[in-house]
Regions:
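N-terminal accessory nucleic-acid engagement/regulatory domains that precede
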Residues: 75-79, 91
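Short helix-loop-beta junction
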Residues: 97-105
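Active-site-facing substrate-recognition patch
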Residues: 1-76, 84-86, 114-147
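Charged helix-capping and loop-helix junction motifs
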Residues: 91-97
């Protein structure tokens, strides 16, 4: 089984991954103003506030043109769906339309639907912590080896 996981991880890591902003969670406090601004833009985009989608769409379209060139007209642009249909629509509908307008990529948004709501990833953490408290945990660290 470990071999399959290793191969899957290798395949995932071999994929091209690009990012425009470096995100630091709020718990990381020692960050510069640029990181705070990036965090705010990400939150604004996810919450569909202040037309943040326009700035992100322009960054995305510019990058896609650089990476794909003329082939862009034959590529379908699809976003990984949000946790609910309402969040998916507020976050991606205008964004995907705008990216398509700016660079000519095919808009795949109309072909994606959220079939059922689920908790957002950050809303899962509390459940895991509660279920962990019902078990016995042995913490293993270097303290066991200090004489």
């Amino acid at each position: 089984m470990a071999r399959i996981i290793d191969d899957n991880i290798k395949r995932q890591l071999s994929k091209r991954m690009d990012f425009f902003l470096k995100y630091f969670p709020v718990r990381v406090r020692n960050v510069g103003e640029d990181a705070v601004a990036a965090r705010q833009l990400i939150w604004d985009f996810k919450d569909a506030r202040d037309n943040a989608f326009e700035k992100v769409a322009q960054m995305t379209a510019k990058h896609l043109i650089q990476v794909c060139g003329e082939k862009i007209k034959d590529i379908v642009f699809v976003c990984v769906p949000a946790s609910t249909q309402a969040k998916n629509e507020s976050r991606y509908k205008a964004f995907c339309n705008r990216v398509s307008e700016l660079c000519g990529i095919i808009n795949g948004y109309p072909h994606i639907s959220v079939s059922g709501d689920r908790l957002a990833i950050h809303e899962h953490r509390h459940d895991k912590e509660k279920s962990l408290s019902k078990t016995q945990v042995i913490e293993f660290d270097e303290a066991y080896f200090k004489g």
